[in-house]
Curated annotation (Swiss-Prot):
UDP-N-acetyl-alpha-D-glucosamine binds at T10, G11, G12, N124, S195, I250, Q295. InterPro entries: GlcNAc_MurG, Glyco_trans_28_C, GlycoTrans_28_N. It catalyses: di-trans,octa-cis-undecaprenyl diphospho-N-acetyl-alpha-D-muramoyl-L-alanyl-D-glutamyl-meso-2,6-diaminopimeloyl-D-alanyl-D-alanine + UDP-N-acetyl-alpha-D-glucosamine = di-trans,octa-cis-undecaprenyl diphospho-[N-acetyl-alpha-D-glucosaminyl-(1->4)]-N-acetyl-alpha-D-muramoyl-L-alanyl-D-glutamyl-meso-2,6-diaminopimeloyl-D-alanyl-D-alanine + UDP + H(+). It is a peripheral membrane protein. This is UDP-N-acetylglucosamine--N-acetylmuramyl-(pentapeptide) pyrophosphoryl-undecaprenol N-acetylglucosamine transferase.
């Protein structure tokens, strides 16, 4: 089978694509894959490193206000579509799947116009502009939140979940504990703001650093690479509590997620797919800087089922964060109830479901 995958810009579009490719490879040793991205997006670093053939097109996203830049974007879209058609005619795929980000716009559109079977995968509860546009042309639309169904033609929608949920199930708890020196006899709270970190989360946690040392549980605090040095300087003056492990970045996240009891994080779609698959309770602080405020809507899908506490960045303080953590960790039965609620929302078989859908469309 030959497939073209396109998606990029952020890890939220790239990692589900890679998880899907890995699932396809497990089931078909002769699978032939071509990944089409942009030369500047994160995918240009990540995808070739995975040993996947990679081609690029030049495209930029639309701005949400009228501007001359949007005129240039239309021209780039038309050129990108022409380039995509050339790549598709040369590779001759059985199916094309787009996982979001503006790069998949011209690729999936070109495939539809060439009568090649097409699927788009929408990770968020509120779709972005690209997937809304493509929904008119594709054969099937895979979604991860039931709330996303309202934005698409009903006859095309299939609920699959996010394939990253399947990958995280392979996490090794013992390796997670060992790699960071986490004490196995203590409950653990993971605080993370994404690969680059989130300053408001860092500031909130640092403001309560002297208070957390008395807590009966331990913390794994991931600052983000950008903020690590600044946090280390602050730690020197305040003093690092024995029950706080500080890291700039975590490379083995599936292992670490398997080893912790509660996570404080942003509400990106991939993060939520991972934590619900594992049944991991969460305090979610959505980024207010994303398109359509989709992280808050993602988080709301969990909080209304009591799988998470949704805490807006505008109302985040260190004291409020510690209250939320204590509420979950100390209240009898609360942690277990949230675990069950999170697990009920998880789709650990998401990669298999997406694989089956793509195979069906490719026939």
């Amino acid at each position: 089978m030959k497939i073209v995958v396109s998606g990029g810009g952020t890890g939220g579009h790239i990692y589900p694509a890679l998880a899907f490719i890995n699932e396809m490879k497990k089931r078909d040793e002769r699978l032939d894959v071509l990944y089409i991205g942009t030369e500047r997006g994160l995918e240009s670093e990540i995808v070739p490193r995975e040993g996947i053939p990679f081609q690029t097109i030049h495209i930029t996203g639309f701005q949400r206000k009228l501007s001359m830049e949007n005129v240039k974007t239309v021209v780039r879209f038309l050129r990108g579509t022409k380039r995509a058609k050339a790549l598709l005619n040369e590779f001759k795929p059985d199916v094309v799947i787009g996982t979001g980000g503006y790069v998949c716009g011209p690729v999936v559109y070109a495939a539809a116009k060439l009568k090649i079977p097409t699927v788009i995968h929408e990770q968020n509860s509120v779709p972005g502009l690209t997937n809304k546009f493509l929904s008119r042309y594709v054969d099937r639309i895979a979604i991860c939140f039931k709330e996303a169904e309202a934005f698409f033609p009903k006859n095309k929608v299939v609920f699959t979940g996010n394939p990253r949920a399947s990958e995280v199930m392979s996490g090794n708890r013992e390796e997670g504990l060992r790699s960071l020196g986490i004490k196995p006899n203590k409950k653990t709270v993971l605080i993370v703001g994404g690969s680059r970190g989130a300053r408001p989360i860092n500031d909130a946690f640092m403001s309560i650093l002297s208070d957390v040392k008395a807590k009966p549980y331990q913390f794994v605090y991931v600052t983000g690479t950008v903020h690590y040095e600044r946090v280390q300087e602050q730690m020197k003056s305040i003093g690092q509590p024995e029950n706080v492990i500080v890291q700039p970045f975590i490379h083995n996240m599936p292992d670490v997620l398997s080893a912790v009891d509660l996570i404080v994080a942003r509400a990106g779609a991939t993060t939520l797919a991972e934590i619900t698959a594992l049944g991991l309770p969460s305090i979610l602080i959505p980024s207010p800087y994303v398109t359509n405020n989709h992280q808050e809507k993602n988080a709301a899908a969990l909080s209304k089922k009591d799988a998470a506490i949704l805490r807006k960045e505008s109302e985040l303080t260190g004291d409020r964060l510690l209250e939320d953590i204590d509420d979950i960790m100390v209240t009898p039965g609360r942690l277990d109830a949230m675990k069950q609620a999170a697990k009920a929302l998880g789709v650990p078989t998401a990669a298999e479901k997406l694989h089956m859908l793509v195979k069906e469309v490719a026939k």
